[in-house]
Amino acid sequence: MNVTIKNDIKIIHMGEKGPNVLSVTRSKEIIAELNYEECKAVIIMGNEKVFSAGLNLKDLMNAKEPEEVSLIFNTLSDLLVSFREFPGPVISIVGGHAIAGGCLIALASDYRYGMFGMHRMGLNEMAIGIDLPPDMLSIISHSISKKDLFEVATQCKMYTPKQAYKKGLINEYIGNPFIGKKKATAEALRRAKKLAGFYINAGEPFVRLKQSLMHDTEFDYEVLISNWFSPETQAKIKKVMSTLSKK
């Protein structure tokens, strides 16, 4: 992970290569970077192929105790909450796949830039038998309209960048493929810096407005953990892992 700060804007590159999985360690590293005393805005990026593939299924499969599974899911929840509780703007640049937890952290951002490409964006929790807790759903509900939220949350569709834009998963779409991915990313970064500067200049009114959009929703994670260890869910996960190992 690479982090730079300039003009009160912190840019977090989760990784130039690889799937940018949200391990407990990586999630805690990102949370630690959301420090309002160090910066007033955050831009988070992946790489040209993957923004983030979400939780590491291998970590989950290797977890033998409920406490281990609880730590993984609760840390993801903490990461999403940290995006919403950071007083300044958190802006995501989605230039590659944003799947499951990766999609969630993008949706937990205040604003999202997307671009052309073969990558996909979506939530697949229901397909593998994992609960999408109400607290996580509440966090993303400010990003997606009511008419699209149910479809996005339950049907496990993997949207193209243009479809993601139409569904509200991203706010701005850079759709000119002739400029190339690097220039598209640079353009998204330029726009993100400009928007971050605008919100920084807005000051306390923006901070108060962002705080007013927060919703307190409780969820018993013991339900999720119990479901994770059920034979049905384990069978689905093993099927997914088998498919991934063949790619």
Question: What residues fall within each predicted segment?
Answer:
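Glycine- (often His-adjacent) and acidic-residue-rich active-site loop
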Residues: 2, 46-79
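Well-ordered beta-strand positions
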Residues: 111, 151, 155-157, 163, ...
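C-terminal long alpha-helix characteristic of the crotonase
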Residues: 114-119, 170-222, 238
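Hydrophobic, secondary-structure "cap" segments at the distal end of domains
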Residues: 136-147
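Glycine-rich beta-to-alpha active-site loop
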Residues: 79-128, 158
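Conserved CoA-thioester-binding segment of acyl-CoA-metabolizing enzymes
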Residues: 1-45
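Hydrophobic/aromatic residues within transmembrane alpha-helices
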Residues: 44, 105-107, 164, 240
